[in-house]
Amino acid sequence: MNTVSSTLISLTATCLLLFSPRQASAGTDQPAAPADTVETAEPQILRLTDDDYKAVAEELGVEVAAIKAVVDIEAGRNHQGFFAPGKPLINFDLTMFRQHARRKGINLSRYSKSHSIVFSSPDARKYGSTQSAQQERLKTARSIDDHTAVQGTFWGMFQIGGFNWKLCGCSSIEEFVERMSKSEREQLELFGNFIRNIGLDQALRNKNWAAFARRYNGPSYARRGYHTRMASAYNRHKKLEKASAENDSSKEKE
């Protein structure tokens, strides 16, 4: 074999090694990644689906539109339960935090300077958004006392107080936070457990918005119009359901 032939064979073998079958199937001429390389997906927020709504509505014996009406009022304009993956929307309540700290004998005055963010209004300008500031307040408050901070915060798309963790069917505060941080379906399940355990499922079943709002939102519900807003939201979702059903029926006839 002459020198030229030997060189060509060597080059061909090298090309075959560099361009593997895995590259060919991927349609690329870049060197293939090692076989044991695992591509990891970015963390994602697991949103509620129609099937999620239907499943929990069936468990509670209520209409899907009734649950969606509560979401419209409690979950803010975006109707979502998360600020970022693993970070549920929260509302840190300083008054509630103080109450639970007092019950545990925690002297919060010791932390007024070292943990000043906890005791001031959320600074949206400094942290980029009000929710970012709230997340930082909660994080700092948890460094004072974890359970007290969780109890002094309202969580997720249904804004359930952390002090209600047992009524949500959780065995511990840690389980409550873990489930709240997992998905919107988990938040919906916790909401279902909560209203069932305090007897509010009946009010939701009967569309008694005043009774529901009085217990869920407190005595100032009427002044804030929670009951009338829920009623309007329910009617809106029923109209959407009807329009969707009529559209599906028309498609079937075509």
Predicted features and spans:
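Residue-level detector of intrinsically disordered, flexible termini
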Residues: 12, 23-25, 242
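Signal peptide processing junction and immediate N-terminal pro/mature segment
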Residues: 20-30
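Catalytic glycan-binding domains that act on GlcNAc-containing polysaccharides
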Residues: 28-254
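Bacterial N-terminal signal peptides that target proteins for export
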Residues: 1-9
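Bacterial N-terminal signal peptides
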Residues: 9-19
